[in-house]
Every structure is written in C-alpha cells, then in structure tokens.
Amino acid sequence: MKDPGLVAVGVAAAVAFGTALALGLPPIQRDKPRRKSWEVSAAFPTPVIAAGATVLVIRVIGYHPPIPLAIVGAVVGALSAAFTAYIEKVFPRPEAG
C-alpha cells in the first residue's frame, strides 16, 4: 500500500507546478546557465517549496486529518505556488552593489 503522506507530497508538487503555470510563471528558468539562475519558475523552486510545506504540515505539525491527505497536499500546493509567484513582492531582491 502506498504511503498517504508520500502521495500527498506528489499531489502538492503537481498542483504547485500547474498552479504556477496558471499564474504566469515560466515553465523553466530563462537565464542560462540554469544552475546559476535565481529566477523563479514553475519547475524550481515551486514544487520543492510545496513538497516541503506538505511534509511540515503532515509530519512536523502532526496533522491527523478528517480530510484525506491528498486534498491537504493539493491545498498546500496551490498556496505554495501563489507564495512562489509573488515571493519577490514579499521579499524584494537586494540592491546589487
């Protein structure tokens, strides 16, 4: 049987990727080389933030749901995609210099 927490993390990552695309984030970073790019995209860091936030909700907080964990993962994924899309408004980039 599949671990419901792992399924929730996968659902969160998939929903976060889709929501980020719907919010207008590019699918991958445009800057090259991509490994040195800090541009936010749907591929990175959006699913990573969603997976981490889902694990925090399930494991660290100890959420024992009346709601299935896959739905919790979907909600956390959508919220983390919205956070990632507007992260530079919350935490502005520092001035170069």
UniProtKB/Swiss-Prot annotation:
This is Probable [NiFe]-hydrogenase-type-3 Eha complex membrane subunit A. Keywords: Cell membrane, Membrane, Transmembrane, Transmembrane helix. The chain crosses the membrane at residues 5-25, 38-58, 67-87. One of the integral membrane subunits of multisubunit membrane-bound [NiFe]-hydrogenase eha. Eha is predicted to form large electron transfer complex and might catalyze energy-driven reduction of low-potential redox carriers. It comes from the Archaea. GO terms for cellular component: plasma membrane. Pfam families: NiFe_hyd_3_EhaA. It is a multi-pass membrane protein. It is found in: Cell membrane. Putative multisubunit membrane-bound [NiFe]-hydrogenase eha is composed of at least 20 subunits. The gene is ehaA. Belongs to the EhaA family.
